[in-house]
Regions:
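Transmembrane alpha-helical segments that form the membrane-embedded catalytic/substrate-channel core
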Residues: 1-9, 97-104
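Membrane-interface amphipathic/juxtamembrane segments adjacent to transmembrane helices
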Residues: 4-53
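Short, amphipathic, aromatic/basic-enriched membrane-interface segments that mark the entry/exit
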Residues: 57-66, 90
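Core segments of transmembrane alpha-helices
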Residues: 65-78
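Membrane-embedded alpha-helical transmembrane segments of multi-pass integral membrane proteins
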Residues: 72, 95-103, 125, 129-132
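Transmembrane helix-loop-helix
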Residues: 83-95, 108-117
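Interfacial loop-to-transmembrane junctions
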Residues: 102-128
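Juxtamembrane boundary at the C-terminal end of a transmembrane helix
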Residues: 131-144
């Protein structure tokens, strides 16, 4: 999401040039990767960023990591919910996608204290879907 443009903006060719000599000493047949790979915000390349750039990159990385961590939960809730309540699952999936965009933009632009709107808007409907799915399954199982 937001990490790729931020990565290439901060770890551009000019920035990576400062690592060329050391890199070629250890890897003579290659150049340092533009984009700062494999640095994830706490490595050798990030140490050379100014404070503002480091915060910007780390906020982008945290948004990315949060998305990666929650993706299995989101997909599982939507997959199971779609068998029981397909229209509700569809709308919650759309709402979650919009909420993830809001979460990403707020976190990257304004920092971690501004992510609450997107986090709540994305998580709460998933829990509602989970409860509705469980309730529907329980009702259909035990009502007879």
């Amino acid at each position: 999401m937001a990490v790729v443009p931020t990565r290439f903006k901060l770890f551009n060719k000019d920035f990576m040039a400062q690592f060329k000599e050391e890199h070629q000493k250890h890897f003579p047949d290659s150049e340092p990767a533009i984009g700062g790979f494999p640095d994830a915000g706490e490595g050798r390349y990030s140490e050379k960023l100014d404070y503002k750039s480091w915060i910007e990159f780390n906020n982008s990385m945290r948004v990315h990591q949060n998305f990666v961590e929650l993706l299995p939960v989101i997909v599982t809730f939507l997959f199971v919910g779609a068998f029981v309540l397909p229209k509700l699952a569809m709308w919650i999936g759309i709402l979650n996608a919009v909420a993830r965009i809001i979460y990403s933009v707020m976190y990257v632009k304004f920092g971690s204290n501004s992510r609450a709107l997107g986090a709540i808007a994305g998580s709460l409907p998933l829990y509602v879907l989970g409860l509705a799915t469980f309730g529907t399954l329980a009702w259909s199982t035990f009502a007879h």
